[in-house]
Amino acid sequence: MFGLGLADVILERFKDFMREQPEPYKFLQVFYAQEKERFLNHKMSDYIKQNKSKEEASILARQGFVSAVGRALEKIIELLLKDFCIKNNVKMTNDKILRAKRINGELDRVKRALWVHFGEYSVLPDIILYQTNKDNIKILAILSVKNSFRERFTETPYWKLKLLQSPVTSHIKVFMITPDNDDEISFKDKPKG
């Protein structure tokens, strides 16, 4: 795995995890916990070797994990959706691809259909599912992938509100995907009533 970024290393480990779990998407939190422990132990050791205090090493290691795991989660979701897309003649792309300096005409049309501007900033959704028919592009759904619900819980409804403003985009489905690592939206017990 030499030369791979951390998100790619985590993705490769998830592929191994998939071979062990028949329904790996149900065990994302288990996988996440394993990766977090592995990463924190390794990084803390590195920071302590650099003469950082244990407390500072812990803070730095956690910050590094949060930034890396977000992109890894997007790659894992893309991997889990790959077969679905192939079976249903659906194409998938993401904001990283669409931000490249050189993209083909099809991807440029996808980008132009979804790009939202906030003053000097432009925003694209994490993952986009779409279909093509000759020169026509139909965007089916956007996926907002968040490692933590707390992270940007307002972003997903914002996308839907923006899309509803135009008859051209009002049909697009919007989904938020999160392992809910902070237990912000999970219900451990069934509600009484």
UniProtKB/Swiss-Prot annotation:
Coiled coil: none
Reaction catalysis annotation: Endonucleolytic cleavage of DNA to give specific double-stranded fragments with terminal 5'-phosphates
Keywords from the UniProt entry: Endonuclease, Hydrolase, Nuclease, Restriction system
InterPro entries assigned to the protein according to its UniProt record, in alphabetical order: RE_BsaWI
Broadest EC class assigned to this enzyme: hydrolase
Enzyme Commission identifier(s): 3.1.21.4
GO molecular function: endonuclease activity
Cytoplasm found in the keyword field: no
A Gene Ontology BP annotation from the UniProt entry: DNA restriction-modification system
Functional summary from the UniProt entry: A P subtype probable restriction enzyme that recognizes the double-stranded sequence CCGG; the cleavage site is unknown.
Similarity-based family: Belongs to the BsaWI type II restriction endonuclease family.
Name under which the protein is recorded: Probable type II restriction enzyme HpyAORF263P
